[in-house]
From Swiss-Prot:
The keyword S-adenosyl-L-methionine applies. Gene3D superfamilies: Ribosomal RNA adenine dimethylase-like, domain 2, Vaccinia Virus protein VP39. HAMAP family: 16SrRNA_methyltr_A (MF_00607). S-adenosyl-L-methionine binds at N28, L30, G55, E77, D103, N123. It is an enzyme of class 2 (transferase). This is Ribosomal RNA small subunit methyltransferase A. The lineage of its organism: Bacteria, Pseudomonadati, Pseudomonadota, Alphaproteobacteria, Hyphomicrobiales.
């Protein structure tokens, strides 16, 4: 990457700015610049896109996104220690990197989004990644403001995102992702690619919005998935009792003796629409 963008190696940047990944912030710095380029390429053509990045840290992925030609990167960083390193990247790419100090969970991404294609590419902090994904999946208006999500998670979370019915990993997250997006696991990232190395393998997931998901009220789908998977080993007549139980299931044409993990996304939407 140094030969590609003329900036110093990331290890030098981290040492010079006294940066260390903090567990409390869910940080694991990705220092393998071949991998950061691979992640950025997974998002497809970037030349006309504005890219949101969450938790850029010392900027390894940020540099890859900019080097591959993104029109602009808007990076949300909570850790003020990382801001000087990111400022150096901004100086190297005048007018193309905007760094916003703040909490991504409290950030209104849609309001910040300029006109044109929007992509979100991020090595998400482990402690907020799933909630951020759910936030991006559940706006009332659809299609969303973003064109694609290219996100790194712990592999176990990635498996939940892409899971279908009758899969051990299938749950509320799989239903929400399958309802509104087409999701795939692109590739795994080993622990040794990070500083410090996490205890688990990570994976990069690519999500693109479905143009016409099954019509369904977001709030109702959240209710039925939360109730059904909250007691996933019980029959639906029992787990959905607070929402109407057997009466609701009969109305939706679903056998009350089935369990949550056997229902397809379409069937969960039938339940939500029967509330």
């Amino acid at each position: 990457m140094a030969a590609l963008d003329g900036l110093p190696p990331l290890r030098d940047v981290i040492q010079r700015h006294g940066l260390d990944a903090r567990k409390a912030l869910g940080q694991n710095f990705l220092l393998d610049l071949n991998l950061t380029q691979k992640i950025a390429r997974t998002a497809g053509a970037l030349e006309d896109a504005t890219v949101f990045e969450v938790g850029p840290g010392p900027g390894g992925l940020t540099r890859a996104i900019l080097a591959l030609g993104a029109r602009k990167v808007i990076a949300i960083e909570r850790d003020t220690r990382c801001l000087p390193a990111l400022a150096e990247i901004a100086d190297h790419y005048p007018g193309r990197l905007e760094v916003i100090e703040g909490d991504a969970l409290k950030t209104d991404f849609e309001t910040l989004a300029p006109q044109g294609p929007i992509k979100i590419i991020a090595n998400l902090p482990y402690n907020v990644g799933t909630q951020l994904l759910v936030n991006w999946l559940l706006p009332k208006a659809w299609p969303p403001f973003w064109q694609s999500l290219t996100l790194m998670f712990q592999k176990e979370v990635g498996e939940r995102i892409v899971a279908n019915e009758d899969d051990d990993h299938y749950g509320r997250l799989g239903v929400l992702c399958g309802w509104r997006t087409e999701a795939r696991m692109a590739f795994d990232v080993p622990p040794q690619a990070f500083t410090p190395p996490p205890k688990v393998t990570s994976t990069v997931v690519q999500l693109t919005p479905r143009e016409n998901p099954i019509p369904c009220a977001v709030s109702n789908l959240e209710k039925v998935t939360q109730a059904a998977f909250g007691q996933r080993r019980k029959m639906l007549r029992q787990s959905l009792k607070p929402l109407g139980g057997e009466r609701l299931l009969v109305k939706a044409g679903i056998d009350p003796a089935r369990r949550a993990e056997t229902l397809s996304v379409k069937e969960f939407c039938l339940l939500a629409n029967s509330l």
